[in-house]
Amino acid sequence: DYIFKLKSPYILARVMRARHLCEHMRLPIGIVGVREPLHIDSSPRGRCLERSFIQGLEVLAKQDLLFESCNRVDELEDLYNSIKQVPEAKVVINHCGNVSTLDDSYKKAMTKLASLPNVYCKVSGFPTDNKVFVKNLLDFISGTFDHSRLMYASNYPVVNLYSSFEDHLNCVREYFNDDLDIFSKNAK
């Protein structure tokens, strides 16, 4: 079940966009944002360009709630275009944008996203078997996003599908030297 025992996150999204309800609605203590998985098969391509999605960003921004984005890599540019329309929206890109190869289109899209002041990147969700890829990814992410907009996330237990919790954590710890900002403070 989702929040308030709703059967779908889309119902909560509709409620959040209902302006007459939104002003009187209280979210449970500890809720700081909303996540809509945009990378799964049931999410239509181009979803983050839909008017309803942009309206959702507007409502979240007005309520000072963040949006956690879990996108397909080839739709990161779409995400940039939607966030540009709601510059006050706070957005966290999950899993470094779900990247598995560092190609030019990924780098271009992530560079554009990093240029927006309210976009953050969760350092999580990448395979760790190729150490050269990991180093190149972390070099790119840390060189593209301001240090204050990077945060660690374990992605546990899903991390076990492509790595191990320990290996993933150790890669990030070694690269960032146990930086308290990335492991704690930036998420606050």
Show where each model-derived region lies.
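Mid-to-C-terminal alpha-helical segments outside catalytic/metal-binding sites
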Residues: F140, T144-M151, N160-K188
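Active-site gating/metal-coordination segments in enzymes
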Residues: D1-D74, N81, S115, K122-T128
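Aromatic-anchored helix/helix-loop segment that forms the rim or "lid"
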Residues: K107-G143, L150
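Short, small-residue-enriched loops and turns at beta-alpha junctions
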Residues: D41-G46, N98-T101, P127-K131, V158-L161
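Histidine/acidic-residue-rich catalytic or RNA/ligand-binding cores of hydrolases
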Residues: L79-Y80, L102-K107, K131-L138, N160-V172
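Non-cysteine beta-strand/loop elements that form the S-adenosyl-L-methionine
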Residues: I31-L38, K90-C96, V119, V123, ...
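Histidine/lysine/aspartate-rich catalytic loop segments that bind and position anionic ligands
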Residues: P87, V92-V119
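Conserved, mostly hydrophobic/aromatic
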Residues: L60, H95, C121, I141, ...
